[in-house]
């Protein structure tokens, strides 16, 4: 199908002091999935909000189904068949599935115009069946997983007879199986002639589900490609204006002596008989599928989990690590997989988030008072070194981009002066430009003699950044590869066997 459903041409949108969109364009064809790619701040979400009527454009034209349109708000866009599923879902948790879908549009009956609950539940059941969802429409949203809530949002879009559905980072909180189910739904929608705008940073998903790709950079339209006629490297170059080789900086240090040695480490039912060495100035990548035991291994080394058998040696000494405090005392640091859930204090400012793991070092033992001035100085210095972009240390951390939030977490741990850093999915949810900055920081750390263990589900990242790569499958270590010689095929072959 090549029928053009939506054309946006010459769209410009200016906010005070910032041109968010500068003469951009987008073409969406019927029954196809268009990826909209670009770094954070490239203008992707702004353009979608212009289409959805949340923002009014300064100039440009929007043609939908051959007619020029200008929606004054979300309600008008929805009624015209344009739906948007936001990254941060906002269901009414104490209301039922049916109530969330039909809110403000409930079927009415009788002269008193009362809500016809029986019809609403029947209609909801029919909607859910279209997505292979066998749920009781009376179920409160609070009892659903994030993935199921997302399916309810898609059901809601279908209830409007949507011809265009915008999905903003739809898989950010989904497991592998949940992603598979979402993609099955998208394929069904395509067959029904529905068009999808798919905003994501995840290259593997883009090439798996999208037909066409449009790239923005700094509020400008860079180009459009058919997914089958482009590749990862070209898209990175389009998004950041430089080649992939520049994204992964070369090693700055030659690995030195053994700093960490793990011998026959096991946790029953989780991973078994894991042994490896980590050297000074080295990045050791750990690859594997979801459920391979990678995160659990790092949690055990950091004292979050207790191991059943095995030994941990640091600088030639057999050590006992039973708690994270033990790990920190042995100069270890751990950037967790989900920074928003288990790393950041979102209601606090940058200063509090940076200093919180190292308060005792600034405590006057005699009068039990914190030296706040020294804390502020050191926190600001560390954030400056790591190039955290912020108006000041008093800025709420929730206002920062994902890349800058990750830098603040890194600054927090650098105050503890670690020698070994465990990085679990260090660039998850951040754009290509911010990833490049994180990679440079990782190389800076190895240049200082720090030892890094990196877990990543992105194979180009594992191969581009690792000196050596360990591959896990089903809780077992399947092999080791030299980073500079490894291929994605080799890694995946080990990960699946």
Swiss-Prot record:
Location (main, coarse): membrane
A Gene Ontology molecular function term of the record: ATP binding
Pfam families reported in the protein's UniProt record: ABC_tran (PF00005)
Top-level taxon in the UniProt lineage: Bacteria
Matches recorded under Gene3D superfamilies: P-loop containing nucleotide triphosphate hydrolases (3.40.50.300)
Keyword match Translocase: yes
Residues reported in the UniProt entry to bind ATP: 38-45
SUPFAM superfamilies assigned to the protein according to its UniProt record, in alphabetical order: P-loop containing nucleoside triphosphate hydrolases
Record's bilayer topology term: Peripheral membrane protein
Broadest EC class assigned to this enzyme: translocase
PROSITE patterns on file: ABC_TRANSPORTER_1, ABC_TRANSPORTER_2, MGLA
Location(s) in or outside the cell: Cell inner membrane
InterPro entries, per database record: AAA+_ATPase (IPR003593), ABC_carbohydrate_import_ATPase (IPR050107), ABC_transporter-like_ATP-bd (IPR003439), ABC_transporter-like_CS (IPR017871), P-loop_NTPase (IPR027417)
Catalytic reactions of this protein: D-galactose(out) + ATP + H2O = D-galactose(in) + ADP + phosphate + H(+); methyl beta-D-galactoside(out) + ATP + H2O = methyl beta-D-galactoside(in) + ADP + phosphate + H(+)
Enzyme Commission number: 7.5.2.11
The keyword ATP-binding is assigned to this record: yes
Keywords attached to this entry: ATP-binding, Cell inner membrane, Cell membrane, Membrane, Nucleotide-binding, Repeat, Sugar transport, Translocase, Transport
The ABC transporter domain, residue ranges: 6-243, 256-494
CC terms in the record's Gene Ontology section: plasma membrane
Function, as annotated: Part of the ABC transporter complex MglABC involved in galactose/methyl galactoside import. Responsible for energy coupling to the transport system.
Assembly mode: The complex is composed of one ATP-binding protein (MglA), two transmembrane proteins (MglC) and a solute-binding protein (MglB).
Stated family: Belongs to the ABC transporter superfamily. Galactose/methyl galactoside importer (TC 3.A.1.2.3) family.
Alphabetical list of PANTHER family matching this protein: CARBOHYDRATE TRANSPORT ATP-BINDING PROTEIN MG119-RELATED, GALACTOSE_METHYL GALACTOSIDE IMPORT ATP-BINDING PROTEIN MGLA
Record's protein name: Galactose/methyl galactoside import ATP-binding protein MglA 1
Organism this protein belongs to: Photobacterium profundum (strain SS9)
């Amino acid at each position: 199908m090549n029928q053009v459903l939506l054309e946006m041409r010459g769209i410009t949108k200016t906010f005070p002091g910032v041109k968010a969109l500068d003469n951009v364009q987008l073409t969406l064809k019927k029954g196809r999935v268009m990826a909209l790619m670009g770094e954070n701040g490239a203008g992707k979400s702004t353009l979608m909000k212009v289409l959805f009527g949340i923002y009014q454009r300064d100039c440009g034209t929007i043609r939908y189904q051959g007619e020029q349109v200008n929606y004054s708000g979300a309600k008008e866009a929805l009624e015209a068949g344009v739906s948007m599923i936001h990254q941060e879902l906002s269901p009414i948790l104490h209301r039922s599935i049916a109530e969330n879908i039909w809110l403000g549009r409930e079927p009415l009956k009788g002269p008193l115009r009362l809500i016809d609950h029986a019809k609403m539940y029947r209609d909801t059941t029919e909607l859910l069946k279209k997505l292979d969802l066998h749920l009781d429409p009376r179920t409160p949203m609070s009892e659903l997983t994030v993935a199921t809530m997302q399916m309810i949002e898609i059901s809601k879009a279908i209830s409007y007879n949507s011809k265009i559905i915008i999905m903003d980072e739809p898989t950010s909180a989904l497991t592998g199986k949940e992603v598979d189910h979402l993609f099955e739904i998208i394929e069904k929608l395509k067959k029904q002639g529905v068009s999808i705008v798919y905003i994501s940073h995840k290259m593997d998903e883009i090439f798996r589900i999208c037909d066409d790709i449009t790239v923005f950079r700094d509020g400008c339209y860079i180009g459009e490609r058919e997914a089958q006629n482009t590749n990862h490297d070209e898209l990175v170059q389009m998004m950041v204006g430089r080649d992939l080789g520049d994204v992964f900086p070369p090693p700055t240090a030659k690995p030195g002596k053994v700093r960490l040695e793990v011998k026959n480490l096991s946790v029953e039912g989780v991973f078994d008989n894991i042994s490896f060495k980590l050297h000074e100035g080295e990045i050791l990548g750990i690859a594997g599928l979801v459920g391979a035991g990678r995160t659990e291994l790092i949690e055990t080394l950091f004292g979050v989990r207790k191991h059943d058998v095995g030994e941990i040696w640091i600088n030639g000494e057999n050590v006992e690590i039973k708690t994270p405090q033990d790990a920190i005392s042995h100069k270890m640091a751990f950037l967790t997989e989900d920074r928003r859930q288990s790393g950041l204090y979102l209601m606090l400012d940058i200063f509090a988030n940076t200093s919180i793991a190292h308060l005792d070092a600034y405590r006057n033992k005699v009068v039990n008072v914190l030296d706040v001035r020294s804390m502020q100085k050191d926190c600001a210095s560390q954030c400056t070194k790591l190039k955290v972009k912020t108006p000041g240390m008093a800025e709420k951390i929730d206002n920062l981009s994902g890349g800058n939030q990750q830098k603040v977490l890194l600054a927090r741990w650098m105050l503890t002066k670690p020698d070994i850093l465990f990085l679990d999915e260090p660039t998850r949810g951040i754009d290509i430009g911010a990833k490049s900055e994180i990679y440079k920081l990782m190389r800076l750390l190895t240049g200082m003699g720090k030892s890094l263990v990196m877990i990543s589900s992105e194979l180009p990242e594992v191969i581009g950044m690792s000196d050596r790569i360990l591959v896990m499958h089903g809780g077992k270590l399947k092999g080791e590869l030299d980073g500079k010689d490894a291929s994605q095929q080799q890694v995946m072959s080990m990960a699946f066997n």
